[in-house]
Curated annotation (Swiss-Prot):
Belongs to the transferase hexapeptide repeat family. It comes from Escherichia coli (strain K12). Disulfide bonds: none annotated. Keywords: Repeat, Transferase. This is Phenylacetic acid degradation protein PaaY.
Length: 196
């Protein structure tokens, strides 16, 4: 994986976390334990600190960056969907930012909230806890139901299990030239582990 030091600052990646080999971490990046960073994600701690706390996931093609001396933080069990952009913002514990959403400088997403796909959260916006946040510009439109909170928790758990799966079985290979006879499909047990 491309990990770069800049101005004497080296990214911190605990052994218990997984960073895909195509993700890029630069400078003042601090990952917690059990963090998943997906393919082609870019975490640039070359102006401000990037913090991803325990159990959070940063999915494929996400960008985390900020202005000089400005932290960008994802709280514990945070869930950042594919191609989201976080710039100098704070995502509180157990919040989800949907695919292609943008959260701008100084914005705060309250804990347990869900930012909908393609939402645009303006700079300095403060969004409440336990709310659905959608639109461009984004607005907190209603409280989340227990079912929605459970759905979010389950999705994040799937990525926490994926950390272990990747560390144990992900490796680069040459492709097959044709489908092998009896090709298996991924089928999961109640703990989200593939059945053998």
């Amino acid at each position: 994986m491309p990990i770069y030091q800049i101005d004497g600052l080296t990214p911190v990646v605990p052994e218990e976390s997984f960073v895909h080999p195509t993700a890029v971490l630069i400078g003042d990046v601090i990952l917690g334990k059990g963090v998943y960073v997906g393919p082609n994600a870019s975490l640039r701690g070359d102006f401000g600190r990037i913090v991803v706390k325990d159990g959070a996931n940063i999915q494929d093609n996400c960008v985390m960056h900020g202005f000089p001396e400005q932290d960008t933080v994802v709280g514990e069990d945070g869930h950042i969907g594919h191609s989201a952009i976080l710039h100098g913002c704070i995502i509180r514990r157990n919040a989800l930012v949907g695919m292609n959403a943008v959260v701008m400088d100084g914005a705060v997403i309250g804990e347990n909230s869900i930012v909908g796909a393609s939402a645009f959260v303006k700079a300095k916006a403060e969004m409440p806890a336990n709310y659905l946040i959608v639109g461009s510009p984004a607005k907190a439109i209603r409280e989340l139901s227990e079912q929605e909170l459970a759905w979010k928790k389950q999705g994040t758990h799937e990525y926490q299990v994926l950390v272990t799966r990747c560390k144990q079985t992900l490796h680069q290979v040459e492709p097959l030239r044709e489908i092998e006879p009896g090709r298996k499909r991924l089928v999961f047990d109640e703990n989200l582990r593939p059945k053998q």
